[in-house]
Amino acid sequence: MKMYQIEEVKPFMAQLLLQETFDKFCVSVAEIRTIVPIAIKGTMSHDWLSPEDAEKYKELEYIPWKLLRPVVFELIKGKQTPDFLKIQFVYYSENGDCGGLRVQFEAGTLTCLSTYTPVEFSLDRNAETLWDENCRAFLKKHEIVSTQL
């Protein structure tokens, strides 16, 4: 588990809300506090989707960010930044392990926290270390300026 403080909030938020940077992730939970607090549980309701999308996303437990991004953008767009924003991204590996990236904005500070949950308990931390490195490489690849805390 590694935490990074994002140094340039505006460019990061543009990538998060307006670009496809995070679209390969799914969202397990999102919380937004603007004029009212909003909590989004990312569990997909496959019956609500079109038949094409239901087939396309049938393997997913959580909603792809690609589908949720426009909704979140509509909730927070405007002149004021939200008081609080937290998005828990998840990414499943082929063996079922779950890597996560929690994005949190609060009191003007933006952080990302890498998380890793193996399918089975293990004392071996190689997969967790690899996920942490992949998250760091992801930030670097997308030119997201950050400092490890």
Model region roles, listed by residue range:
Residues 3-6, 68, 101, 108, ...:
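Generic alpha-helix detector with strongest preference for long hydrophobic helices that associate
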Residues 112-149:
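Mixed-charge, glycine-accented linear interaction segment located at domain edges/termini
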Residues 1-63:
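Charge-rich, low-complexity N-terminal segments
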Residues 56-109:
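Surface-exposed, low-hydrophobicity interaction/linker segments
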